[in-house]
UniProtKB/Swiss-Prot annotation:
Function summary: Ubiquitin-like protein which can be covalently attached to target lysines as a monomer. Does not seem to be involved in protein degradation and may function as an antagonist of ubiquitin in the degradation process.
Entry keyword set: Cytoplasm, Isopeptide bond, Nucleus, Ubl conjugation pathway
Cross-link Glycyl lysine isopeptide (Gly-Lys) (interchain with K-? in acceptor proteins) residue location(s): G90
Keyword Cytoplasm found: yes
Record's GO cellular component terms: cytoplasm; nucleus
Protein name, UniProt field: Putative small ubiquitin-related modifier 8
Summary of subunit composition and partner proteins: Interacts with SAE2, SCE1, SIZ1 and MMS21 Covalently attached to a number of proteins.
Localisation: Nucleus; Cytoplasm
Family named by the database record: Belongs to the ubiquitin family. SUMO subfamily.
Top-rank taxon, per record: Eukaryota
Keyword Nucleus annotated: yes
Miscellaneous information on this protein: Stress conditions rapidly and substantially elevates the amount of SUMO1 and SUMO2 conjugates with a concomitant reduction in the amount of free SUMO proteins. The SUMO conjugation system plays an important function in stress protection and/or repair.
Gene name of the record: SUMO8
UniProt xrefs under InterPro entries: Rad60/SUMO-like_dom, Ubiquitin-like_dom, Ubiquitin-like_domsf
């Protein structure tokens, strides 16, 4: 078969992404490229037993919105999404003498 007989690679309509939390625990999802990530985020929340409202998801350091799709974010097969629990506060006073 010559190189001209080869069919061009057509990207799959699905990708596999890894969602990793701050404890380096990973959950893998196979998702459609054109479907909102809301479904995956809720599935992750259920899987780890954490309220969805307390989670933040990031790709390349940018927060992911519920209505964004993998195509909109430029997600590719085997990309990693970070999941963080919401942190309240974060401010402390230090008194120096």
């Amino acid at each position: 078969m010559s190189s001209s007989d080869k069919k061009p690679l057509i990207p799959s309509s699905h990708i596999t992404v890894k969602v990793k939390n701050q404890d380096d625990i990973c959950v893998y999802f196979r998702i459609k490229r054109d479907v909102e990530l809301r479904k995956m985020m809720h599935a992750y929340s259920d899987k780890v037993g954490v309220e969805m409202s307390t989670l933040r998801f990031l790709f390349d350091g940018n927060r992911i919105k519920l209505n964004q799709t993998p195509n909109e974010l430029g997600l590719e097969d085997e990309d990693e999404i970070e999941a963080f629990g919401e942190q309240l506060g974060g401010f402390s006073f230090f008194h120096r003498h």
